[in-house]
């Protein structure tokens, strides 16, 4: 074992410090690094961020048209728009399609005592983000009433809001049941703050993206204002002043279609060209939506252009596997695409998803190379981490000394180190759809977090860094190129990469189990060893592992198990075993629709303890996502509990059983 550890540590030191990447020849590294342009990507961000890119909208269509034009100009194959019905009736697995929502006009004015407009509060034409998504048409004048958060009955005590507009600190959707449905308010003005980070509410001029429930029978409108505007209103209301507002919204909801731009670089190997590596992003989000997620969309467009240009000029050979690029709406568009195109899904070997990859220093962004779910281990994440470590080392050296083989900088960009973090699976974007056990596609997720301007009026192009865009695109492009070309001849180098990172993960596991009771520590250890063996087995998704490599793999994990120790066997008591309903694909919570709530009931869902559980390394939504992933027709409920405890921290068997019983009740599992 000492010899194994020594060889792995030596290999790791080489890959981090040398000016090359395993599995990517030096000429390929140079070609991609020199061609890929963060400045080009930033120009694309500027173009996309002009549009208010709501799903199934005129703004989204305009952004899609730009992508199609650029793909055609870059010379990609199979360039087209995939159109899938979005009418509020059609289902794509667990996603109820959401219809088109378009706005022709929306303004909010303060009205003087003489009935004339005295001050414009919001204008859709000037800033579309000021109108909450899915707002209904209205043309009315009403007094403004401060209703606090707007989500508690106590917020309305002693206040008459019937026929009036409420000023609230919560998202409009959360306010509707009480303010509009119960107490009769006719509209909402919200100053919901930016998402909670260390910089929460620090900038009082931010305007947050607002939402209303697409499918609610209670139709209303919501305007979004800054904290400064809200405080100014509140100061006047506290003195007893009456504030009259005129709200006018001209919007429509209609049957439409999810538009998904796609194009390919066709594989050249007759034996492998049917297989696909997919690059994805999500094209929707409000104007400006620069980092979220015009940045990811621009980055994969730049990767497509880079590959195509390098192949055309002979600096790269065509890939062995086909490389596909897709630009759907977040979550719902991706799920619709995967459900509607099983002919494509069956050929996808891996996906690389980019969501927020350009945040400069002002955004406070930290770049993450994020793994897929622990329930579905894959070596592709080790490949991405290896490339991320290479870029970290190169950019740190450049920042500290002014010299590096591959600084990966842009003239107009920053010179700071990338500082990428390598982290386990987190939820929050389309990667969780690819990886969901309905599809089981291994995924690499590249993303920024935190971002102080996410979902606000300040998510603008000026806060992005062209150097950051170049580096994040390079990590993705290098990962994708390796995956598009690896064969059994690369098994040795891949195994060395997996081996080194397996040891690092084992060290992390040993630290984490120290504070656990013996039973949970043993559970953590058993799952870890299963995870590492399964990760090595994932090589076979791409090729048959050669005998000279496979004979090393299992002895290594036997020795690793002996080194780790503390894995006492657990007798598996008789327990329920569930399997997925193959006719229903997707997770329970998607975009604008919750399958569990819709079918199990709101009150009954709220009583599910697993959804509220807070573990050492995850919370309710993560536990629920992985619980469904772990259902495979073989694991017992107790074994699923053990796996969840190992991934996120101890949880009771009763809580897991209750959740699985709820899924069985609505025929998600059987």
Residue ranges and their predicted role:
Residues 21-25, 37-60, 70-78, 95, ...:
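Catalytic-core environment of secreted peptidases
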Residues 619-670:
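Long, charge-rich, low-complexity alpha-helical segments
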Residues 122, 220-225, 230-231, 328-453, ...:
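Metal-dependent peptidase/peptidase-like ectodomains
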Residues 465-538:
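Charged, amphipathic alpha-helical linkers/stalks
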Residues 46, 56-58, 119-221, 288, ...:
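Extracellular/luminal Protease-associated
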Residues 124-155, 209-292, 302-305, 309-318:
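Soluble metallo-hydrolase cores and metallopeptidase-like ectodomains found primarily
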Residues 28-35, 49-58, 95-96, 131, ...:
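Second-shell loop/turn segments in exported
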Residues 19-24, 34, 38, 46-162:
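Noncatalytic luminal/extracellular "stalk/propeptide" segments of secretory-pathway proteins
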């Amino acid at each position: 074992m000492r010899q194994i550890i020594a060889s792995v540590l030596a290999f790791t030191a080489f890959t981090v410090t040398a000016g090359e990447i395993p599995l990517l020849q030096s000429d390929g590294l140079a070609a991609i690094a020199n061609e890929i342009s963060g400045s080009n990507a930033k120009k694309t961000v500027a173009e996309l961020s002009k549009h208010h890119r709501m799903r199934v909208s005129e703004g989204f269509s305009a952004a899609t048209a730009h992508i199609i034009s650029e793909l055609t100009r870059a010379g990609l194959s199979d360039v087209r728009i995939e159109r899938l019905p979005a009418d509020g009736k059609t289902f794509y697995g667990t996603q109820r399609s959401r219809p088109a929502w378009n706005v022709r006009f929306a303004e909010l004015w303060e009205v003087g005592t003489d009935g004339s407009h005295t001050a414009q509060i919001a204008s859709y034409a000037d800033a579309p983000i000021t109108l909450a998504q899915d707002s209904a048409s209205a043309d009315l004048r009403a007094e403004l009433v401060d209703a606090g958060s707007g989500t508690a009955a106590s917020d309305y005590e002693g206040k008459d809001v019937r026929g009036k507009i409420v000023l609230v600190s919560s998202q409009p959707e959360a306010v509707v049941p009480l303010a509009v449905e119960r107490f009769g308010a006719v509209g909402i003005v919200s100053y919901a703050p930016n998402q909670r980070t260390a910089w929460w509410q620090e900038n009082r001029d931010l305007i947050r993206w607002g939402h209303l429930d697409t499918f609610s029978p209670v139709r209303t409108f919501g305007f979004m204002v800054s904290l400064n505007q809200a405080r100014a209103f509140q100061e006047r209301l506290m003195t007893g002043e009456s504030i009259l507002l005129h709200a006018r919204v001209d919007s429509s909801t209609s049957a439409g279609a999810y538009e998904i731009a796609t194009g390919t670089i066709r594989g050249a190997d007759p034996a492998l060209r049917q297989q696909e590596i997919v690059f994805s992003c999500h094209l929707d989000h409000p104007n400006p939506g620069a980092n979220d997620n015009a940045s990811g969309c621009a980055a994969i467009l730049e990767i497509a252009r880079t590959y195509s240009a390098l192949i055309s000029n002979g600096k790269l050979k065509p890939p062995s596997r086909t490389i596909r690029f897709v630009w759907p709406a977040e979550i719902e568009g991706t799920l619709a695409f995967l459900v509607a195109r099983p002919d494509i899904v069956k050929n996808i070997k891996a996906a690389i998803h980019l969501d927020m990859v350009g945040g400069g220093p002002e955004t406070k962004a930290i770049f993450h190379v994020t793994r897929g779910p622990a329930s579905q281990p894959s070596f592709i994440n080790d490949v991405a981490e290896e490339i991320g470590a290479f870029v970290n080392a190169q950019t740190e050296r450049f920042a500290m000394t002014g010299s590096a083989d591959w600084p990966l900088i842009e003239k107009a960009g920053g010179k700071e180190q990338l500082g990428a973090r390598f982290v386990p699976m987190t939820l929050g974007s389309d990667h969780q759809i690819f990886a969901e056990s309905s599809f089981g596609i291994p995924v690499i997720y590249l993303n920024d977090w935190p971002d102080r301007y996410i979902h606000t009026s300040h998510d603008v192009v000026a806060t992005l860094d062209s150097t950051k865009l170049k580096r994040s695109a390079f990590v993705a492009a290098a990962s994708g190129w390796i995956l598009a070309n690896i064969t059994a001849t690369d098994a040795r180098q891949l195994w060395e990469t997996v081996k080194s990172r397996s040891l690092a993960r084992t060290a992390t596991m040993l630290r984490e189990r120290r504070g656990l009771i013996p039973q949970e520590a043993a559970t953590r250890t058993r799952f870890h060893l299963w995870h590492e063996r399964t990760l090595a087995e994932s090589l076979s998704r791409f090729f048959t592992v050669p005998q000279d490599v496979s004979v090393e793999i299992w002895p290594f994990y036997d020795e690793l198990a002996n080194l780790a120790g503390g894995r006492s066997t657990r007798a598996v008591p008789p327990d329920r075993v569930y399997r997925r309903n193959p006719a229903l694909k997707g997770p329970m919570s998607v975009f604008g629709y919750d399958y569990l709530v819709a079918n199990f009931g709101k009150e009954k869902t709220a009583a599910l303890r697993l959804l509220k559980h807070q573990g050492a390394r995850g919370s309710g939504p993560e536990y629920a996502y992985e619980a469904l992933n772990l259902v495979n027709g073989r694991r017992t409920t107790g074994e699923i509990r053990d796996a969840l405890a190992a991934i996120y921290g101890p949880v009771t068997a009763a809580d897991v059983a209750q959740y699985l019983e709820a899924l069985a009740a609505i025929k998600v599992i059987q």
